[in-house]
Amino acid sequence: MHALQAKILDPRLGTEFPLPQYATPGSAGLDLRALLKEDTVLEPGQTLLIPTGLSVYIGDPGLAAMILPRSGLGHKHGVVLGNLVGLIDSDYQGELMVSCWNRGNTPFTITIGERIAQLILVPVVQAHFDIVEQFDETQRGTGGFGHSGTR
């Protein structure tokens, strides 16, 4: 398990609301909560930045974090991440904010302390470009967007 430095930016986190934690021993994501001042209605088509009351510092350039949606919010209520995935670089130290987008047809109320997203750690491999005149030929070549078939 990797140690992750964290700052509590909202005093309710860790007292009124639990710190991010894994729901089960097999969980990949730490639940992030909406540390709002009041319950907030997210209208259809609306996107809002929701504070989590937490900042983290990963520190290891071989790791990054991703903020991912919670499947139940998207499937049951149409609430997903406005940026689809939030990428947290290893040297970022600001508050974790969650962009919530209501793609549904009905208003959705985000309640104070509600679990709205999850944070996962992922390995990072940085690359550099080797500029070439042409690539070694492959069977696929430049075919994309369904080129390999549907079955």
From Swiss-Prot:
Pathway: Pyrimidine metabolism; dUMP biosynthesis; dUMP from dCTP (dUTP route): step 2/2. Keywords: Hydrolase, Magnesium, Metal-binding, Nucleotide metabolism. InterPro entries: dUTPase, dUTPase-like, dUTPase-like_sf, dUTPase_trimeric. It comes from the Bacteria. Gene3D superfamilies: 2.70.40.10. Coiled coil: none annotated. The keyword Nucleus does not apply. Its EC number is 3.6.1.23. Its cofactor is Mg(2+). Pfam families: dUTPase. It catalyses: dUTP + H2O = dUMP + diphosphate + H(+). Signal peptide: none annotated. GO terms for molecular function: dUTP diphosphatase activity; magnesium ion binding. Substrate binds at R70, S71, G72, N83, L87, I88, D89, M97. One of its GO terms (biological process) is dUTP catabolic process. This enzyme is involved in nucleotide metabolism: it produces dUMP, the immediate precursor of thymidine nucleotides and it decreases the intracellular concentration of dUTP so that uracil cannot be incorporated into DNA. Belongs to the dUTPase family. This is Deoxyuridine 5'-triphosphate nucleotidohydrolase. The lineage of its organism: Bacteria, Pseudomonadati, Pseudomonadota, Gammaproteobacteria, Pseudomonadales.
